[in-house]
């Protein structure tokens, strides 16, 4: 189907070209005939004018006999005859127009300086120039276009789009290539060599550390000689060492408690001690149970007290501490046994506090808890 359409279009184009050639030949023939007619009319007018002049010269008596008014003579002298108004340059221009190839381009070659005369010759030429039949032919020829083919138009548009896209892609590639930094071969080689040297040093250090680990760990913990087995064996060995350390610390604590029990004196002389001595010993035991530790850091005081349990002891101690210009920031209470209590105070010294050293603070706290 496409081949048939193309053949039909080519045949139509061929017919149109033949019609144009025939029209052009007819126009040339018409131009030649009209130019010949114009030439004949000009020659007739010239011959007619010469005959009139000869008649006037041959018959002077008639001119003398005829009485012409003076005003008519002046009008004849002022108004030239239409036959004498014709100029040779315009005629030569008309003859030169016969050599033109296209009849519709005559107006471009007319002389613009020649004035318009009311002569039959000029009217005929103007009629020829503005012939409506010729203008219709010219418009038909100019308006005749090739038949519309949507496939060809679509292909041409696709080609244009592809060309535009290709040009844009090439420009982008050129820009990208320009933006890339150009490196010399020497710089690339130097970078490669430095990278190789750094990698060698890293591997060497890793091998040294792995060898040191392998020498410390027993061989029973290393199943293979690779890096993963060495690291895994080291982790297992460290865990076992931690367990052994915890067990040894527990054994040490148990031995210390047994030694303290053996050192308690078993003396029967205590049975014969008098009641006075027993009272004094009880007081010493009570005082020995009271333990006070004070640490001073600038305006902050950490106070730890261990004493026997008494009713209302904590409230009374807090009131007395406030009287000594201490503010309680934090308090922690623990009771290791039913008869003993330990207090942990976090205090802040105010500006009006007279106690500055740790010894003074411990002495004041001892008085509070002994009373």
Swiss-Prot record:
Subcellular location(s) per record: Nucleus
Transcription regulation recorded as keyword: yes
Alphabetic keyword roster: DNA-binding, Nucleus, Transcription, Transcription regulation
KW Lipid metabolism (keyword) present: no
Biased composition (Polar residues): 270-279
Boundaries of every bHLH domain copy: 190-241
Stretches with biased composition (Basic residues): 172-181
InterPro entries assigned: bHLH_dom (IPR011598), FAMA/SPEECHLESS/MUTE-like (IPR044283), HLH_DNA-bd_sf (IPR036638)
GO terms (BP aspect): cold acclimation; guard cell differentiation; regulation of DNA-templated transcription
Residue ranges, compositional bias (Basic and acidic residues): 250-264
Tissue expression per record: Expressed constitutively in roots, leaves, stems, and flowers.
Ranges for region Disordered: 149-190, 250-285
Gene Ontology MF annotations: DNA binding; DNA-binding transcription factor activity; protein homodimerization activity
The protein's assembly and partners: Homodimer.
Protein name: Transcription factor bHLH70
Organism: Arabidopsis thaliana (Mouse-ear cress)
Gene name tied to this protein: BHLH70
């Amino acid at each position: 189907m496409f081949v048939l359409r193309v053949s039909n279009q080519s045949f139509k184009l061929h017919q149109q070209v033949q019609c144009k050639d025939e029209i052009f030949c007819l126009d040339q023939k018409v131009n030649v005939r009209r130019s010949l007619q114009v030439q004949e009319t000009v020659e007739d007018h010239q011959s007619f004018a010469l005959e009139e002049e000869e008649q006037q010269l041959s018959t002077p008596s008639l001119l003398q006999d005829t009485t012409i008014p003076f005003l008519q003579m002046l009008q004849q002298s002022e108004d030239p005859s239409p036959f004498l108004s014709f100029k040779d340059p315009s005629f030569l221009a008309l003859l030169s127009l016969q050599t033109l190839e296209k009849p519709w381009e005559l107006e471009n070659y007319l002389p613009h300086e020649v004035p318009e005369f009311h002569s039959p010759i000029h009217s005929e030429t103007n009629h020829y120039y503005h012939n409506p039949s010729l203008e219709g032919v010219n418009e038909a020829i100019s308006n005749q276009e090739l038949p519309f083919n949507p496939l060809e138009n679509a292909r041409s548009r696709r080609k244009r789009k592809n060309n535009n896209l290709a040009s844009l892609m090439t420009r982008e590639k050129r820009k990208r290539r320009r933006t890339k930094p150009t490196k010399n071969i020497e710089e690339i080689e130097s970078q490669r060599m430095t990278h190789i040297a750094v990698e060698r040093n890293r591997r060497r250090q890793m091998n040294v550390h792995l060898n040191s680990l392998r020498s410390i760990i027993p061989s029973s913990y290393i199943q293979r000689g690779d890096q993963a087995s060495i690291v895994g064996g080291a982790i297992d060995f460290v865990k076992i060492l931690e367990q052994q350390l915890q067990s040894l610390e527990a054994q040490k604590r148990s031995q210390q408690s047994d030694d303290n029990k053996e050192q308690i004196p078993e003396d029967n002389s205590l049975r014969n001690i008098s009641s006075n001595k027993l009272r004094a010993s009880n007081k010493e035991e009570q005082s020995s149970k009271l333990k006070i530790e004070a640490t001073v850091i600038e305006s902050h005081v950490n106070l730890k007290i261990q004493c026997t349990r008494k009713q209302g002891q904590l409230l009374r101690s807090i009131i007395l501490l406030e009287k000594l210009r201490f503010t309680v920031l934090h308090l922690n209470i623990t009771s290791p046994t039913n008869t003993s209590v330990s207090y942990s105070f976090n205090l802040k010294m105010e500006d009006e506090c007279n106690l500055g050293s740790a010894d003074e603070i411990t002495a004041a706290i001892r008085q509070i808890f002994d009373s």
